[in-house]
Amino acid sequence: MTDKTYKIAVLPGDGIGPEVMAQAHKVLDAIEKKHAIHFEREEHDVGGIAIDNHGCPLPQSTVTACEESDAVLFGSVGGPKWEHLPPNDQPERGALLPLRKHFQLFCNLRPAQIHSGLEAFSPLRADISGRGFDIVVVRELTGGIYFGQPKGREGEGANEKAYDTEIYHRFEIERIAKIAFESARLRRKKVCSIDKANVLQSSILWREVVEEIAKDYPDVELSHMYIDNATMQLIKDPAQFDVMLCSNIFGDIISDECAMITGSMGMLPSASLNESKFGLYEPAGGSAPDIAGKNIANPVAQILSAALMLRYSLGEEAAAQDIENAVSQALAAGELTADLAGDKPALSTAEMGDKIAQYILNS
């Protein structure tokens, strides 16, 4: 039987991006050996390195490569070297935002969990974190108050005012809700939709549409929660949640709260998808220029981003689970990079990649 072939645009970027991406390559190599899958991978410049080599943070050659691929595996962009540039020309705003817009990536998926053996890194009490924390935040990324019109400032003195507009169309809510329910089917089959339907008209529509979509997923349990209560419940009893479905602004808040509960940004992957399930996959953390090139960065977020790519864009669930299980095995065995090791011996970035790849091959 011939291997299935997928074309992946690999954009390592700046800072720790290239060294953690090298570990994702090792893991994908291991997946190729274990499964009947082949990845055609091409690396392209993005962010600061693209400014240096091409004069802009997102060269057309990189965009074209992404268009011709099944998915994009993204590292990180930015650093002090480019901070003097006008904001729209800096790596972050000049690369990531245009990519999201070009590919109409309306859905952001942010998994967050406390891995076995790492409970001490969570700021939650041990009796709370010990009950488990394993959540996916499904955030609508292109609508809502960040993009709604009108927005602006006018007037002066005591009458000066500023305004933003929260707008959601039915189709925007329908498509994000479907992804939340489909994600829940791959997990524990629970969706909690976050809104403010006791106050906001946009949230009333949100709740109505989510309930309509839920009828197509009778195997998934739907609940609703107001955003203010949700932020409290995440601290009080995070184990109750599985998939949290959020508007843009509420998802922005909730996903960062979930990240802090885990205790390590170096562990958190992220996916941004469009309607055809084409996706951009990246670590939730930044480019960490202060530790770049030192071989000490935690590559787990980049590796888990590759697992999300396999699950959501390529439909290779077994391979995705192999990566996630290998990460869990390494962490449970106390194989940790410097950000987690404390006073124990730490693995280098490259050693961590080697360990996880080996666990995949041994499974």
UniProtKB/Swiss-Prot annotation:
Binding site for NAD(+): 79-92, 286-298
Subcellular location: Cytoplasm
Positions annotated to bind substrate: R100, R110, R139, D228
GO molecular function annotation: 3-isopropylmalate dehydrogenase activity; magnesium ion binding; NAD binding
Top EC class of this enzyme: oxidoreductase
Catalytic reaction list: (2R,3S)-3-isopropylmalate + NAD(+) = 4-methyl-2-oxopentanoate + CO2 + NADH
GO BP term, pick one: L-leucine biosynthetic process
Cofactor-binding details, from the entry: Binds 1 Mg(2+) or Mn(2+) ion per subunit.
Function of the protein: Catalyzes the oxidation of 3-carboxy-2-hydroxy-4-methylpentanoate (3-isopropylmalate) to 3-carboxy-4-methyl-2-oxopentanoate. The product decarboxylates to 4-methyl-2 oxopentanoate.
UniProt-listed PANTHER family: 3-ISOPROPYLMALATE DEHYDROGENASE
Subunit structure: Homodimer.
The protein's name in its UniProt record: 3-isopropylmalate dehydrogenase
Organism: Vibrio vulnificus (strain YJ016)
Record lineage: Bacteria, Pseudomonadati, Pseudomonadota, Gammaproteobacteria, Vibrionales
